[in-house]
């Protein structure tokens, strides 16, 4: 495990309310660092991309897509890649959702974890596996391919390298197409985690954090 030390963030500044009183930013509802656009605020191109996303399998525009909508050409291309990575790869949904949770855990991405934990459970990833991943404990895998996906992604992130033996094993189990898809999922959800982190996109108010205290 690679441990990094961060400076404690400064206390958020106080701000003046509409009535003139001072209040600390911590007492106000959480707001992301960029405004999330309402349809009435969108340009014609933004509205077009918004409607494309909302009419697809996601059914709505939220999270990183809401940030990317400020750059509609980016949003259009990213949502197409995301649709492939989430719905159209050669991997079973059980493995793709497991891989997404591994990425969320690596990045400590509360939003990504919140959004995909129920999807992983629905796809057949066991609750004990998810709990162990969250807590940094040995994972009681239900299937050997889950262990291999976890190992592959962990080694890739910790060493920035894939040894020949590991590559051969993952190709043997997932096939060459499956490995390409797995790397694509990892890359796409890294982009998502970075976007969520930089622009401070959080789960809905009242959602308890699950990853902040993980080792």
Placement of each model-derived feature along the sequence:
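Compositionally biased, intrinsically disordered low-complexity segments enriched in Pro/Arg/Gln/His
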Residues: 9-16
């Amino acid at each position: 495990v690679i441990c990094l030390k961060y400076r404690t963030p400064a206390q958020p500044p106080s701000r003046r309310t509409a009535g003139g009183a001072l209040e600390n930013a911590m007492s106000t509802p959480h707001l992301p660092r960029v405004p999330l656009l309402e349809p009435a605020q969108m340009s014609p191109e933004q509205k077009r991309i918004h409607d494309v996303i909302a009419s697809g399998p996601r059914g709505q525009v939220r999270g990183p897509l809401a940030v990317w909508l400020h750059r509609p050409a980016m949003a259009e291309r990213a949502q197409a890649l995301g649709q492939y990575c989430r719905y159209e790869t050669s991997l079973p949904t059980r493995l793709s959702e497991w891989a997404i949770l591994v990425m969320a855990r690596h990045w400590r991405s509360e939003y990504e974890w919140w959004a995909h934990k129920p999807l992983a459970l629905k796809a057949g990833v066991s609750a004990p596996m998810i709990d162990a991943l969250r807590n940094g404990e040995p994972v009681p895998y239900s299937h050997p391919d889950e262990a291999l996906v976890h190992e592959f992604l962990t080694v890739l992130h910790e060493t920035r390298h894939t040894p020949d033996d590991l590559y051969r094993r993952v190709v043997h189990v997932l096939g060459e197409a499956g490995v390409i898809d797995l790397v694509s999922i990892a890359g796409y959800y890294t982009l998502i985690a970075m976007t969520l982190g930089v622009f401070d996109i959080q789960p809905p108010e009242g959602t308890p954090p699950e990853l902040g205290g993980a080792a």
